[in-house]
Amino acid sequence: MSTDELQLTFFVFLQLIIRAMKKTELIINPDGSLFHLHLLPGDIAEKIIIVGDPGRVEMIAEMLDSVRVRKSNREFYTVTGTFRETEISIISSGIGTDNIDIVLNELDALVNIDLATGMTVEEPRSLTIVRIGTTGGLQAELPVGSFIATTKAIGFDGVLHFYEGYEWCLDHMLADSLVAHLEWPDLLAYPYAVDADAGLLEKLSAGATKGITISTPGFYAPQGRRLRLEPFDNELNDNITSFRFKGQKITNYEMESSAIYGLSKLLNHKALTLCVVIANRVTGEFLADYKPAVRKLAAHVLEELSS
């Protein structure tokens, strides 16, 4: 074999390796859908509601005037339809920022990557993403059943640290102030803070308390709960409750918003989280029948997204 033939063979082999790598970067199912969400381009609307519970997707879908897409895989259930002539998708993410990493990246790929070539489209689109969820209140004055609009999301999870060039979208002063207040240990991921989309916050926050939200990487010790295992800091919740930043309080715990806000900023999407307080961690009050409150919040979001 000549030198030219060897070079050509090597080039072809190299291209095959590159293509194989790309296939493991953006995994496509045999039907052309994305690996986890099992969605095709065109299955989603530009306005999207994210919930954790797949059952909550169906609850909100019942309010739609019509439905054109119903698809599910694992914990990811998607319904796309119309409300007041506005197309809206409702998608369940499951629990946690790790799942949000999947959902946000695959939603973005559906509108901003040519799935056949793996190339970014010439004119990227911006999605409107609203998370509707439940939450634990961290201030005594927040009654169960009330709504919270997340002005800033603080991540204890570390997901955003795995992405290059994310620093521009962070509120460093807020994160550094909280780290100092909590005497945050070096062995944990450094907290990061990201703002909500200002336009969505103004449009959708009527009737809600505005506050800073902490997204944790777990439900028990990461939120100060004790069962058989003790959390590393028994005063964590008290110290979070007493924290102030430019007159603002940390109002609640949940497990998704930091990644939603951070990835949305990096991918040029608009994001907001609205939650129903179902437990007040200060007073110990718990709302067992919280579904009517979630339904009320969802109706409000649908009305505002369609106006």
Language model regions located:
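Metabolite-binding pocket within alpha/beta catalytic cores that recognizes anionic/polar moieties
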Residues: 21-192
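A short, acidic, amphipathic alpha-helical segment used as a generic capping/interface helix at domain edges
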Residues: 237-247, 253, 257-263
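Generic structural signal for well-ordered, non-membrane alpha-helical segments
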Residues: 50, 54-57, 93-100, 104, ...
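Short, often N-terminal, low-complexity regions
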Residues: 1-3, 8, 14-16
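Glycine-rich beta-alpha junction loops
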Residues: 136, 153, 214-221, 259, ...
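Zn-dependent metallopeptidase/amidohydrolase metal-coordination segment
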Residues: 258-290
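His/Asp/Glu-rich mid-to-C-terminal helical/loop segments that flank catalytic regions of hydrolases
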Residues: 280-307
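Active-site rim beta-loop-alpha module in soluble metabolic enzymes
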Residues: 174-245
